[in-house]
Amino acid sequence: MGAIKASCPGSCGELFQCVVDGEEFLMSYGIEKKSQVVIGPQTGVMEEGLRPKMLQVINELTDQIDFDYTFQTDISVGKGYSSSTADMLSILGACSAYKHGTVSVPLLTSLCSKIEPSDSVGFSDWTVMNPLNGAIQWQTRWKPKLYVYILEPDQMVDTTSFIRMTDSPLYPAEQSKTLLTDFKIACDKQNVELLGSVATRSALLNNKRLPKPYLNDIIDLVNKLGLLGVNIAHSGSIVGILLTEEQLMHMTELEERLSHHPLASYYSLRNLSKIIYDGLQVKKVEEILE
């Protein structure tokens, strides 16, 4: 069989995360950063070795790595970009297609969750899932045209080391239940304003468990400029400012205000990304070259 290429986007944290009846749920959206794996009998010089979690998860699918591979990524680690999930899904997707000829995103996501709590970046539709087992709670086909201005600090964190929402006495789990309900309403009504509100509320609730520096200042600025909302990496360090396409006209003023605020030295890396709906993409290399 010829070579197979698989890629999976990272995310800027989660649009929202909540606890319902003692069970954790989250929804991640894709951004223009990705992990990519090519496997086959001959793929050329290996550019980068597989990361430890990729090697761990591949053992859930096969007991023999009898193929060559290349691995590339532009997703930062230890920030909340879903880098591990994107890495694992890329190698799983490529291996599954190469060895078995089929790819099941729900199955592969559940395999990732055996290694560590995972995100829903593998799905091309927005998907609410349990990060601990990959079980799907709800999906929507709505694909609003949105952007995110990502605020990234220099420091890295171990995103798996934080206490879970369900175990944290600081997290207001009961209040968070409405996030899931309101997210469903926002999607059914295609209401981007309610969507932004869900994201911001989720960020504020999580701030009681894992405070983000300057979060309230960022939200105040977003409200002053009339932007959509703020979302965060609930177990990471990055923050996202959500914008509609029409609100991109405020980007110059937004960056100017951010750059003159003390938060600029903390969130020193700032970049704009389109929110994408690619999910896990798997193709034969010949199809890519045609």
Residue ranges, per PLM feature:
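DPxDG-like acidic metal-binding loop motif
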Residues: 79-105, 121
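ATP-dependent small-molecule kinase catalytic core of the GHMP/sugar-kinase superfamily
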Residues: 103-228, 244-290
